Design a protein with these regions (language model features):
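Conserved helix-loop-beta segment at the catalytic/binding core of cyclic-nucleotide signaling proteins
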Residues: 80-113, 128-142
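Regulatory sensory/coupling modules that transmit signals to nucleotide-handling catalytic cores
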Residues: 1-17, 179-180, 196-204
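A common structural junction motif
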Residues: 123-127
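Short beta-strand-to-loop capping motifs
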Residues: 57, 105-110, 164-165
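Conserved beta-strand cores of small sensory beta-sandwich domains that regulate signal transduction
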Residues: 51-53, 95-96, 104, 161, ...
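Conserved long alpha-helical elements within nucleotide-processing catalytic cores of c-di-GMP signaling
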Residues: 23-24, 29-41, 47-51, 58-84, ...
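Alpha-helix-centered segments that form part of catalytic cores
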Residues: 146-162
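Catalytic/regulatory signature loops of cyclic-dinucleotide turnover enzymes
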Residues: 128, 158-159, 164-202
């Protein structure tokens, strides 16, 4: 590579660095934290018209304990692809990855519920390929006794916390707070919850 080519490479690199939307996560191809923060700055003042969703692949750790890590990347990529292609059906829908198993969606409030439900249905169908027939029939990945009580851990699913109205938190804390609510949601049978101020206060 000569000087001219090297200079062109650096110019292209710097152009991309000026726009965080061009910094995709290697595993998923989705925009990562810099792009999420930039988009959050646009969406947060418009909560109500726009919604922000925090989506997690629930019960993936029990799956990895039982079945091993061989298909770990494949599961993450399928979740990302399902969320991305589902949300592409409407204008101005943003999908990014905030951590290994967690994603952020931002779009108009009128579209969010439909996106989330459709993505959940598609993912539920897709994960059938990762479990044994026995686990699918029982809808349980792991089962064990804790303090004399039988604990059954279900199959992987997408769970979502949605912020669609102003909540009593700063923009800089919103994603952190949504992630914390998502952790609590994972211990329930619910797939979707709309975030409120009581949920934020409970965890602080």
């Amino acid at each position: 590579m000569g000087t001219a080519e090297a200079r062109k490479y650096i110019q292209e690199l710097r152009r991309k660095q000026e726009n965080p939307y061009l910094w995709p996560d290697f595993l998923t191809g989705l925009p990562d934290k810099p792009a999420i923060l930039k988009k959050l700055g646009e969406a947060f003042p418009k909560l109500g018209k726009y919604s922000i969703a925090y989506v997690r692949i629930a019960n993936i750790h029990p799956y990895l304990i039982k079945y091993g890590p061989d298909r770990h990347a494949d599961i993450i990529q399928w979740a990302a692809a399902i969320l991305k292609t589902t949300c592409e059906k409407c204008r101005n829908c943003f999908v990014g990855t905030v951590s290994t198993h967690d994603f952020i969606i931002m779009c108009e409030s009128k579209d969010m519920g439909g996106h989330i439900r459709e993505a959940g249905r598609i993912f539920k169908k897709r994960i059938e390929a990762y479990y044994s027939k026995e686990d699918l029939q029982k809808k349980t990945a792991l089962s064990f006794i804790r303090n004399g009580e039988r604990i059954n851990v279900g199959l992987m699913r997408l769970i979502t916390v949605i912020a669609d109205n102003k909540v009593h938190t700063e923009k800089s804390r919103l994603i952190h707070d949504m992630g914390r609510v998502c952790e609590a949601l994972e211990t329930t049978d619910d797939d979707i919850v709309v975030m409120n101020n009581a949920m934020i206060c409970k965890g602080r």
